[in-house]
Swiss-Prot record:
This is Deoxyguanosinetriphosphate triphosphohydrolase-like protein. Residues 1-22 are annotated as: Disordered. One of its GO terms (biological process) is dGTP catabolic process. It holds the Pfam family HD. It comes from Listeria monocytogenes serovar 1/2a (strain ATCC BAA-679 / EGD-e). GO terms for molecular function: dGTPase activity. HAMAP family: dGTPase_type3. NCBIfam families: dGTP_triPase, PRK01096.1. InterPro entries: dGTP_triP_hydro_central_sf, dGTP_triphosphohydrolase_C, dGTPase, dGTPase-like, dNTPase_3, HD/PDEase_dom, HD_domain. Belongs to the dGTPase family. Type 3 subfamily. Residues 63-252 form the HD domain. Keywords: Hydrolase.
Length: 465
């Protein structure tokens, strides 16, 4: 892979806005950034769960604040990487132009990376997957089950449903501004946000690039168009490795910080989590010792302040620097598409990551309030699927008379954007493809909801409010 192509600043459609060369000095990627920030899809992230579902506290993260943090960390890492590539002469073909583009692309990708997530966080994704696994074989169309009618790839798209794959749909199809191109972002930005460049038929948890579904069957031609333009093809875009680290760092730090602020975990428990690991490497030892020092130095201060200082000044720096060491050491393999690991997992910070993850799992993710909220979120999403999937089965079919009056009324609740996207993509397609697209219509609708809207709609449809 070559940076000239990987950083492709062309768009699927040339911008229809006339820009004055004298007054508009924005780069294509700065333009991407502004399009994202000003989009409704980005604003909706302020009412989508990060860890604490339906959380009303002003302090804890939502998907919006998380995405802003990922964007900031990713851009910072981009600046560090471009500096080192030039200083250490890691790539003779690397230019100043490349160095200017990379941080801008990463800033955009950080904002975008969670834009396809359904309500109620990652548990919402799992709720969608479980519902389809449980119900595709029981819902019928013309006396045949959907599991019999759909192709293997169509079925796997729902069994492996993934918010990251939904990002492509949101920004390139569903976010209708002027036409079918959505936000019409650059090829480089779109490719950087594709974490898993594989279809649902090629999911393989042993490979970093194929751990999860990367794009839906309905978006295969879009995926091919993007990766052909960047010449990444079926390889992971090098910037995706950096985006992944930024995401990991943001959630590892934020989950623990938010947990301390809410009183779910304290410094004594964090130190104990470190002490339960018998032999610390240098990275882990440094972070452990710093937390002990800070807790003694700032004794009497709020624990959330101490942990916040520790995470910002010690943990985050270790995670970034150790991950970037792996990027530099494996630069050629990354550019060749043969590096098969997460930067952070392959680094000397892996032990630290495992401790932080264990602390979050033990004290935060298992907290009674969070578990109760996740169960409520699962019930809401499952019930919405149970309501809307049957309603779309005979919409735009060869037997529309089989739609009930209730089905027709439910369809009026689905956004005209989503219905318009369905009609455009279904035009001239086979009956099976149309049926598949109608199922996607419902997941598009649900993924576009905020937590509050999903909860309110569920309550209204079930006579609870």
């Amino acid at each position: 892979m070559k940076w000239d192509k990987l950083l492709n600043d062309k768009r699927r459609r040339e911008s229809g806005v006339t820009r004055s060369k004298n007054t508009d000095v924005r780069s294509a990627f700065e333009n991407d950034f502004q399009r994202i920030v000003m989009s409704a899809s980005f604003r909706r992230l302020q009412d989508k769960t990060q860890v604490f579902p339906l959380e009303k506290s002003d302090f804890v993260r939502t998907r919006l604040t998380h995405s802003m943090e990922v964007s900031t960390i990713a851009k910072s890492m981009g600046n560090m990487v471009t500096h080192t590539i030039q200083e250490e002469n890691l790539d003779q073909d690397f230019t100043k132009d490349h160095a200017e583009k990379i941080p801008e692309i990463l800033a955009c990708a950080g904002l975008l990376h969670d834009m396809g997530n359904p309500p109620f966080g990652h548990f919402g994704e799992e709720s969608i997957r479980e519902w389809f696994r449980d119900n595709l074989a029981t819902i019928t169309y013309k006396n045949k089950s959907l599991a019999e009618i759909l192709t293997p790839q169509m079925k796997e798209d729902f069994y492996y449903f993934e918010g990251n794959a939904q990002v492509l749909r949101v920004v390139s199809k569903l976010h209708y501004l002027f036409d079918q191109y959505g936000l019409n972002l650059t090829f480089a930005t779109l490719n950087a946000v594709i974490k898993y460049p594989v279809s649902s038929l090629k999911v393989n948890k042993k490979q970093i690039k194929s751990k999860k579904l990367g794009y839906f069957y309905a978006d295969e031609s879009l995926f091919n168009e993007i990766t052909t333009a960047t010449e990444a093809l079926d390889n992971r875009h090098p910037l995706t490795y950096l985006l992944e680290v930024a995401d990991d760092i943001a959630y590892l730090n934020a989950d623990l910080e938010d947990g301390v602020k809410k009183g779910i975990v304290n410094i004594t428990q964090i130190l104990k989590g470190f002490e339960e690991v018998e032999e610390h490497n240098k990275v882990t030892a440094a972070c452990y010792n710093e937390l002990k020092k800070k807790s003694e130095r700032y004794e009497g201060q709020e624990e959330s302040f101490i942990v916040q200082q520790w995470l910002a000044s010690n943990v985050r720096g270790q995670l970034i620097n150790r991950s970037l060491e792996v990027f530099y050491e494996n630069y050629d393999a990354i550019m060749a598409g043969t590096f098969n690991d997460s930067l952070i997992d392959a680094s000397s910070a892996e032990q630290l990551v495992q401790i932080l993850q264990s602390l979050s799992f033990t004290y935060i993710y298992q907290d009674k309030g969070i578990v109760e909220s996740e169960i409520a979120g699962n019930e809401i999403i499952s019930k919405l699927l149970e309501t809307f999937i049957p309603a779309v089965i005979y919409y735009d079919s060869e037997t529309p008379e089989r739609q009930t009056a209730k089905d027709k009324r439910l369809l009026t609740l689905i956004s005209d954007n989503y219905l318009g996207c369905y009609r455009k993509n279904a035009e001239g397609e086979s009956e099976t493809m149309k049926l598949y697209l109608r199922l996607l219509l419902v997941t598009d609708f649900i993924c576009g909801m905020t937590d509050s809207y999903a909860k309110d709609l569920y309550q209204r449809l079930n006579g609870l409010s």
